[in-house]
A protein has these predicted regions:
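N-terminal glycine-rich FAD/FM-binding segment characteristic of electron-transfer flavoproteins
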Residues: 1-190
């Protein structure tokens, strides 16, 4: 799982140790494989392909004990966190669910996805599906802006493939400044 490179049909690479090392995975030739890939490792293909599409029919009887009720969208117009070109994230320094609205407002203003550190999720400032990092979502936006996120290694693992990282944190020694392309040591509320 979490494949970041395909060397050949039975040889893959995947990150381990919070993304600090890459392991070679070899499967026995001729075996059937099921694999998951790390979304952030590949760029989207685009719409200009010329692959042929073959239509096939399947003779499968519909189940008698299940039925389709309806299809609903997840709602909201904010881009999906894992496919957004820009992501605005907040950390524990926002100090409340009400203050976290600033993250949503800025994300909506620029058409970005909204994310959070594990500390912000654990504190109840935002829902779990916004968590970015090793135990959340691995993302690779062109622009990642972090407000009040210290930069624990687990969070950095989730953003290491971002194009440009901007960090705002009042602690000038916060680890996030080590990976940020642009850093501002300031209080978000001033």
């Amino acid at each position: 799982s979490d494949i970041s490179a395909v060397e050949d049909a039975y040889h893959f690479k995947r990150p381990i140790y919070a993304g600090n090392a890459i392991v070679d995975v070899h499967a026995p030739e001729g075996s059937r494989l099921v694999a998951t890939v790390r979304v952030a490792s590949w760029k989207a293909v685009g719409d200009a392909g010329n692959a042929t599409i073959e239509s096939r029919s399947a003779n499968a009887a519909a189940s008698s004990h299940t039925r389709f009720v309806k299809l609903e969208s997840g709602g909201g117009e904010r881009p999906d966190l894992q496919t957004a070109a820009s992501v605005i994230s907040g950390g524990r320094a926002l100090a409340s669910k009400e203050n976290f609205e600033l993250i949503y407002d800025l994300a909506d203003l620029i058409g970005a996805g909204a994310g959070a550190s594990r500390a912000a999720v654990d504190a109840g400032y935002c829902p779990n599906d916004m968590q970015v990092g090793q135990t959340g979502k691995i993302i690779s936006p062109d622009l990642y802006i972090a407000f009040g996120i210290s930069g624990a290694i687990q969070h950095i693992t989730g953003i290491k493939d971002a194009g440009t990282i901007v960090a705002v944190n009042k602690d000038a020694d916060a680890p996030i400044f080590e990976v940020a392309d642009i850093g501002l040591a300031a209080d978000l509320f001033n």
